[in-house]
């Protein structure tokens, strides 16, 4: 009798396993199906992350034959949008296109962060690296990094820089530069990338770090001067702009944009979405739209993306603590 019962139990376990596999397969086959997909951008429209999201959404919906709506949910340096993602149903119909700052900087800047970047989200893949540029106002008597550092050291705190807000990546980039060169700069936070760029153009501040795609149009109009890029090597499209690393060896900043899902989304859906996004990022038409805006394709799916988030988080923890940057 016991032998019969054991055999019967084994049959039940095997059947349950088959049902589980069948259920998993049906989930993958059934997604997406007659439902709008939301892609949350935790920033206002018009910024670098938003631009990336709209390009990816356009090509992704063509592959999925499904409508994808880009939903801008800005506020608190990305907290509002990522909290909305955390609270969404883990069914694969809500994702977020986020920059690195809400994932790697916010945990060290904000005391009561409403999400855990490592536990509350599935890290699908990075998609883009956003090269950074250090630009200065034309009136500043510094034509290279060495002259800028010398000028700043001659009057500590006398030079000011614009950021898009406390804890924003443009803030952290400047702090890292100051720490690496031993200079003291005055931080002037603005409410967003647009206002910070306009403040620099107006001469309210002397310098600013931001995405090449954001600042380069003003450089071409001679409203700003490009001092250096934060890439490890000179950019092919900007061969005359030196890197900061040419003066400060090892100095590199590589902001990124990537896609995350709320924790709990079934693995078959995650795998399907990952596959489709990676195909989008190889599409020549999509790549051209990115390169036209000085955006560099960088795909690190799954565990590679998680490792990047962890590495950058450790890096910015040191910068934030050294600069004593805190927000309630």
What feature does the model see in each segment?
Residues 102-112, 176-180, 207-240:
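A ligand-binding cleft/hinge motif common to bilobed small-molecule-binding domains
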Residues 51, 55, 59, 80, ...:
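Extracytoplasmic/secreted proteins, especially bacterial periplasmic and envelope-associated proteins
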Residues 1-34, 146, 328:
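Short, low-complexity disordered leader/linker segments with a strong preference
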Residues 43, 59, 63, 88, ...:
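Structured segments of extracytoplasmic/periplasmic soluble domains
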Residues 28-119, 158-160, 166, 182-209, ...:
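N-terminal (or domain-start) structured segment
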Residues 31-33, 87-93, 108-195, 244, ...:
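Hinge/capping helix and adjacent helix->loop/strand transition within the periplasmic-binding protein
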Residues 33-36, 180-183, 220, 267-328:
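An extracytoplasmic/periplasmic, membrane-proximal ligand-sensing/linker region
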